[in-house]
Design a protein with these regions (language model features):
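Conserved small/polar residues in nucleotide/adenosyl-binding loops
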Residues: 258-259
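Hydrophobic positions on the alpha1 helix immediately C-terminal to the Walker A/P-loop
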Residues: 15, 19
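Inter-Walker segment of RecA-like/P-loop motor cores
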Residues: 31-83
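P-loop (Walker A) phosphate-binding loop of NTP-binding proteins
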Residues: 7, 35, 229
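Walker A/P-loop nucleotide-binding motif
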Residues: 2-14
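Walker B catalytic acidic pair
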Residues: 86-88, 128
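Loop/turn-to-beta-strand initiation segments
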Residues: 29, 79-82, 118-123
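Conserved helicase motor core of P-loop NTPases
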Residues: 1, 113-120, 128-254
């Protein structure tokens, strides 16, 4: 297996595009996958190739006689194929009792599916600075030691130099500064640089509603993200957006209430 890791702006996207084109030139097939539908859509957009969610590709639903609802591991019918998985940091190996997908351990199932055919290879791409799956300290899919436990050799390529928007992007500049603090175990709160960059605007509280509304109008709700430090604050923001921007003041009703 090959693991390609790197922080934002280090060229992972460019490397993946070049890799896919090179494999195509050598007449080697590729299958692109990602853990979520959104990640698969992004992967497909920048490679201009079809991309699937991992679940859609590796599982199939049981027939009615076997018990409709559960999904079992699909047979890998590909030959001499590279399976390229983006956003691999999100792949969990935590078993869930209520899971209807395979063993319930996605990483186990992914590796078993790919290596049903010895001519197939797996490439995992991701950012180790991103949060690991829920209830896990490290991302198992980007942990070389854990991957080697499956019995194969893991080659790793780590991209460390920021190549994209180093000077132009304040978001990338601040993210890199925070990451360096974490790597060096520095204590205290980070100091964010905001005035030197054109892609960062400081918004006063009194102007926040208008700023969010303008972003919704210009970019759309799906492309506007609000990040806050706690679930409590997130709930407050969501309620405020519903009431003051989307004009949905009614309370959310549960399905049981809707049936009354």
């Amino acid at each position: 297996a090959l693991m390609i890791t790197g922080y934002a702006g280090t060229g992972k996207t460019t490397a993946v595009k070049a890799l896919i084109n090179t494999l195509y030139d050598f007449k080697i097939n590729t299958v692109l996958m990602a853990p979520t539908g959104r990640a698969a859509k992004v992967l497909s957009s920048y490679t201009r190739k079809p991309a699937f969610t991992i679940h859609k590709k590796i599982y199939r639903q049981k027939s009615a006689k076997d018990g409709l609802g559960d999904f079992v591991l699909e047979k890998n019918l590909h030959h001499r194929t590279f399976f390229i998985v983006d956003e691999a940091s999100m792949i969990s190996n935590q078993s869930f009792d209520m899971s209807v997908f395979g063993s319930g351990r996605l990483l186990d199932d992914l590796i078993e599916y790919v290596y049903q055919n010895a001519s197939c290879k797996l490439i995992l791409i991701g950012d180790t600075a991103q949060l690991p799956p829920v209830k896990m300290d490290l991302s198992p899919a980007l942990n070389p030691g854990q991957l080697e436990g499956y019995g194969f050799t893991v080659k790793r390529s780590f991209l460390s130099d920021i190549l994209r928007q180093t000077r132009e992007s304040g978001i990338l500049y601040n993210a890199t500064s925070i990451r360096k603090m974490i790597d060096q175990d520095e204590s205290g709160y980070p100091k964010l640089a905001v005035s030197e960059f054109s892609d960062i605007d400081t918004v006063l509280g009194a102007d926040l509603v208008e700023a969010i509304s303008d972003a919704y109008d210009q970019y759309g709700i799906e492309e506007t993200v609000i990040i806050t430090r706690s679930n409590k604050r997130a709930n407050q923001f969501n309620q405020g957006i519903r009431n003051q921007i989307l004009w949905r003041e009614e309370e959310l009703a549960t399905r049981s209430e809707e049936r009354r």
